[in-house]
């Protein structure tokens, strides 16, 4: 048995499914998860000592690569001062100022420890601000594992959602309406039917949990206009795409301002950190100023803040996003070319440093289109690439990520491996 297999068997005795987040278990693709021993730059090494090119990067945070020397130094510099205080620090102010500078729609921001905390708190705040209960989300968009958000649409346009997770009470699910992503007509119909009941619309402007699916400008502009007209709070969940698709996130990319924004991943630099923020008049409803309660013992943790602040400083280097975007596009264009040469139906897309791979004839625009991809072929491709030492997301429904350390040599090695993998698929 390999060390990975030994560790997985051992883990399953004390950890449900052997993992602390389901996608890590390889249930979608089959096989044994890789247990990471260490990482550096664009690579990680598993428990058996094998090196992999990493296109997950901790699911997005590692935009400057693993163990960047300046991020490491920033963390080391604060460790000796204490791990956690449960009291304010100057560093919390500094990272808040940096976030507000980079995302102008965020006038005030509250730090939390996870993306789920950020979205859950933003929804509570929107409900407290509006005095309404109904929220609208979109099929295929993932906003963490809070009860209100683990809901998927029924067959009808305006049906109430049914829980997609056991343990979510129907009384909670009934307040969530799920619509089709990028469907402007469905959106207009929903607002026409009950627009004045909607507390908030929460959306991934660039979805990354049904693979990569871009919000269309028409769809996102319609969201902005309808929320403004009906007094609903527009929440952009940029936990994944924030500081990934552009320096100012999706809002800078599309030129659309949200009322509230949820951030995570990059702002922690690999440490547990997230945030939600937005208009000052909405944020004023948070305790201790207002009646919407939200708290967290480790919110603004000094070690996480140090890693996040240094990462936010590094990504502001001149040309950082131009180079990162070009390198990501070089990867996806190259993969598409290799698939064409092998005669394998395949499409790829990228925006900033996020990318999607689809075993389909074209890039999807909705969850329904994503589900038409050839999942069995993706699973085989995943394992062929894994054998080659290239680690893509172990699910056909997840986006991938490139870091500033994925240089030409790394991309070339990936494309050479893909050439062999696509040839094997076509055989």
Swiss-Prot record:
InterPro entries: 4pyrrol_synth_GluAld_NH2Trfase, Aminotrans_3, Aminotrans_3_PPA_site, PyrdxlP-dep_Trfase, PyrdxlP-dep_Trfase_major, PyrdxlP-dep_Trfase_small. Signal peptide: none annotated. It is found in: Cytoplasm. One of its GO terms (biological process) is protoporphyrinogen IX biosynthetic process. The modification N6-(pyridoxal phosphate)lysine is found at residue 265. GO terms for cellular component: cytoplasm. One of its GO terms (molecular function) is transaminase activity. It catalyses: (S)-4-amino-5-oxopentanoate = 5-aminolevulinate. Pathway: Porphyrin-containing compound metabolism; protoporphyrin-IX biosynthesis; 5-aminolevulinate from L-glutamyl-tRNA(Glu): step 2/2. Its cofactor is pyridoxal 5'-phosphate. Its EC number is 5.4.3.8. Keywords: Cytoplasm, Isomerase, Porphyrin biosynthesis, Pyridoxal phosphate. Homodimer. Belongs to the class-III pyridoxal-phosphate-dependent aminotransferase family. HemL subfamily. This is Glutamate-1-semialdehyde 2,1-aminomutase. The gene is hemL.
């Amino acid at each position: 048995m390999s060390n990975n297999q030994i560790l997985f068997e051992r883990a399953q005795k004390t950890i449900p499914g052997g993992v602390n987040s389901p996608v890590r278990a390889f249930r979608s693709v089959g096989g044994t998860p890789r247990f990471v021993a260490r990482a550096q730059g664009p690579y990680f090494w598993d428990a058996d000592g094998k090196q992999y090119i990493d296109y997950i990067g901790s699911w997005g945070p590692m935009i400057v690569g693993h163990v960047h020397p300046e991020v490491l130094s920033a963390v080391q510099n604060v460790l000796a001062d204490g791990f956690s205080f449960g009291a304010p620090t100057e560093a919390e102010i500094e990272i808040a100022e940096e976030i507000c500078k980079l995302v102008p729609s965020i006038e005030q921001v509250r730090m939390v420890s996870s993306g789920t905390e950020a979205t859950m708190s933003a929804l509570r705040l929107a409900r407290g601000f509006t005095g309404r209960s109904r929220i609208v989300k979109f099929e295929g968009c993932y906003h963490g594992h809070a009860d209100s958000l683990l809901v998927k649409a029924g067959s009808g346009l305006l049906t109430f959602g049914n829980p997609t997770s056991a343990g979510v009470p129907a009384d909670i699910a009934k307040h969530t309406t799920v619509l089709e992503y990028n469907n402007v007509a469905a959106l207009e119909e929903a607002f026409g039917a009950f627009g004045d009941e909607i507390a908030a619309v929460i959306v991934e402007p660039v979805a990354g949990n049904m693979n990569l699916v871009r919000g269309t400008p028409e769809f996102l502009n319609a969201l902005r206009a309808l929320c403004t007209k009906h007094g609903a709070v527009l929440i952009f969940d940029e936990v994944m795409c924030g500081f990934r698709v552009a320096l100012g996130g999706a809002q800078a990319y599309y030129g659309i301002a949200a009322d509230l924004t949820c951030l995570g991943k990059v702002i922690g630099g690999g440490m547990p950190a997230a945030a939600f923020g937005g208009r000052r008049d909405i944020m004023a409803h948070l305790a201790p100023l207002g009646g919407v309660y939200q708290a967290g013992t480790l919110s603004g943790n000094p070690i996480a803040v140090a890693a996040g602040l240094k990462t936010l400083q590094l990504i502001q280097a001149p040309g950082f996003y131009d180079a990162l975007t070009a390198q990501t596009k070089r990867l996806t264009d190259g993969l598409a070319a290799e698939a064409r040469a092998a005669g394998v139906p395949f499409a790829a897309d990228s925006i900033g440093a996020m990318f999607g791979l689809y075993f389909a004839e074209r890039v999807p625009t909705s969850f329904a289109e994503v589900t038409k991809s050839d999942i069995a072929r993706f699973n085989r491709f995943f394992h062929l690439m894994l054998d080659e030492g290239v680690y893509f997301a172990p699910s056909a429904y997840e986006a991938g990520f490139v870091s500033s350390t994925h240089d030409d040599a790394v991309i070339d090695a990936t494309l050479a491996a893909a050439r062999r993998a696509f040839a094997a698929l076509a055989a």
